[in-house]
């Protein structure tokens, strides 16, 4: 297996292409059937063809299959020449188990868009570390595209813009006006009631403009590959992107302190905190940003707090491994580097 010294780029997506989906951990095609079918039907209505991974509809208690079965499911989607985009169905807890069994040579020979979030971070980061392929922290089939309107439509708008756009010029994100982290209407056939929507509270703490390569994903998942050959090296000047879901404030302090003890904060030029879904503040009324500032202990690192690339809805799509620019004065975030190939 060769390891790329420069970014490897997948071909862009086009409406009408084929998306293959895999279940690298939780068996949600079984446990959340209604939401699964909603996600499938949503993408089909948008004009995409879908290929089911071999573990679709399968369950082995807490997971979709054995470690090697799950790795084989993913590899078979890589081998399929008809597939342009490989999408996670959902996260879980055990995607890191697959990393020794993925066919990295095949990924290099035929790079495809690989997208997902949460526990899929292990695959996104590990594949980038081993191949240089730019991967995408973005929607997964069941939680994201199984969501109801209007939030699913905003998620899709970012997904299609990022993955189909011509690779010229700078792309500046438009942050959604409203968001939600309510878990209602998860697997029901009918909407029980509309979700509570909150005004976007994304905040830019810092001044000037910071540019750097973005590295990261779901922080809790990154601890499962930390220190291994599948964890991308964090370099001086990188922008650290981290998000999490349903964690307690005690856990978040531990995770942020882990980063400090590993001297990550001595290297990064900025931090992006994704919105934290259903954060448990233990009655303190403190938010993850406040925990982070205490852990930083006076160290001045600009922070974009509450970026809409996380477990909340809607979700923006973020390429990992490319340069971002965060303008703290004008309060915007942009992709400044090519992240897809120019040829289909």
From Swiss-Prot:
InterPro entries: Carboxypeptidase_A_C_sf, Class_I_gatase-like, LdcA_N, Peptidase_S66_N, Peptidase_S66C, S66_fam. It comes from the Bacteria. GO terms for biological process: bacteriocin immunity. Pfam families: Peptidase_S66, Peptidase_S66C. Keywords: Bacteriocin immunity, Hydrolase, Plasmid. The keyword Mitochondrion does not apply. One of its GO terms (molecular function) is hydrolase activity. The keyword Nucleotide-binding does not apply. Involved in specific self-immunity to microcin C7. Belongs to the peptidase S66 family. PANTHER family: CARBOXYPEPTIDASE VC_A0337-RELATED, MURAMOYLTETRAPEPTIDE CARBOXYPEPTIDASE. This is Microcin C7 self-immunity protein MccF. It comes from Escherichia coli. The gene is mccF.
């Amino acid at each position: 297996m060769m390891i790329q010294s420069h970014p490897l780029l997948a071909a862009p997506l086009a409406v009408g292409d084929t998306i293959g989906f895999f279940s690298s951990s939780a068996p949600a095609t079984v446990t959340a059937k209604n939401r699964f079918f909603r996600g499938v039907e949503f993408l089909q209505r948008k004009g995409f063809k879908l290929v089911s991974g071999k573990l679709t509809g399968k369950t082995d208690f807490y997971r979709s299959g054995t470690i090697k079965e799950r790795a084989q499911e993913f590899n078979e989607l890589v081998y399929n020449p008809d597939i342009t985009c490989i999408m996670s169905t959902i996260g879980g807890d055990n995607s890191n188990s697959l990393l020794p069994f993925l066919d990295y040579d095949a990924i290099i020979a035929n790079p495809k868009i690989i997208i997902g979030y949460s526990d899929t971070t292990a695959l996104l980061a590990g594949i980038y570390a081993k191949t240089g392929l730019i991967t995408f922290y973005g929607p997964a089939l069941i939680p994201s595209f199984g969501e109801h309107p209007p939030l699913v439509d905003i998620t899709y708008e970012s997904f299609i813009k990022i993955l189909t756009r011509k690779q010229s010029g700078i792309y500046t994100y438009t942050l959604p006006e409203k968001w939600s982290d309510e878990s209602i209407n998860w697997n029901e056939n009918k909407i029980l009631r509309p979700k509570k929507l909150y005004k976007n509270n994304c905040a830019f703490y810092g001044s000037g403009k910071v540019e750097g390569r973005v590295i990261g994903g779901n922080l809790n998942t990154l601890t499962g590959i930390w220190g291994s050959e599948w964890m991308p090296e964090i370099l001086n000047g990188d922008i650290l992107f981290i998000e999490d879901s349903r964690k307690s404030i005690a856990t978040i302090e531990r995770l942020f302190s882990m980063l400090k003890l590993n001297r990550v904060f001595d290297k990064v030029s900025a931090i992006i905190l994704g919105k934290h879904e259903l954060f448990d503040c233990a009655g303190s009324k403190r938010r993850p940003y406040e925990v982070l500032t205490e852990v930083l202990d006076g160290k001045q690192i600009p922070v974009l707090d509450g970026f809409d690339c996380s477990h909340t809805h809607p979700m923006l799509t973020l390429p990992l491994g490319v340069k971002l620019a965060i303008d703290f004065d004008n309060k915007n975030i942009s992709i400044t580097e090519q992240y897809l190939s120019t040829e289909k």
